[in-house]
């Protein structure tokens, strides 16, 4: 007979790597063309003037300039739009 109870196994103990999402260039910051402005899942931020959207919804600068954010009201949900002011 065993004098110690055997240890059981657990179904926990895993975690995914962080995806480093979020704003990479804030309002008033100067950026160059091609700079990543926001990494996101879905469209929390919408692309505005001189801003492009990648296939993974990443927003990036199309031209050199200064980052500006604006709030827009759309379908009872406040959204934010990101622009590059030249």
From Swiss-Prot:
<dbReference type="GO" id="GO:0022625">
    <property type="term" value="C:cytosolic large ribosomal subunit"/>
</dbReference>
<protein>
    <recommendedName>
        <fullName>Large ribosomal subunit protein bL27</fullName>
    </recommendedName>
</protein>
<dbReference type="InterPro" id="IPR001684">
    <property type="entry name" value="Ribosomal_bL27"/>
</dbReference>
<comment type="similarity">
    <text>Belongs to the bacterial ribosomal protein bL27 family.</text>
</comment>
<feature type="region of interest" description="Disordered">
    <location>
        <begin position="1"/>
        <end position="24"/>
    </location>
</feature>
<dbReference type="GO" id="GO:0003735">
    <property type="term" value="F:structural constituent of ribosome"/>
</dbReference>
<keyword id="KW-0687">Ribonucleoprotein</keyword>
<keyword id="KW-0689">Ribosomal protein</keyword>
<dbReference type="GO" id="GO:0006412">
    <property type="term" value="P:translation"/>
</dbReference>
<dbReference type="InterPro" id="IPR018261">
    <property type="entry name" value="Ribosomal_bL27_CS"/>
</dbReference>
<dbReference type="Pfam" id="PF01016">
    <property type="entry name" value="Ribosomal_L27"/>
</dbReference>
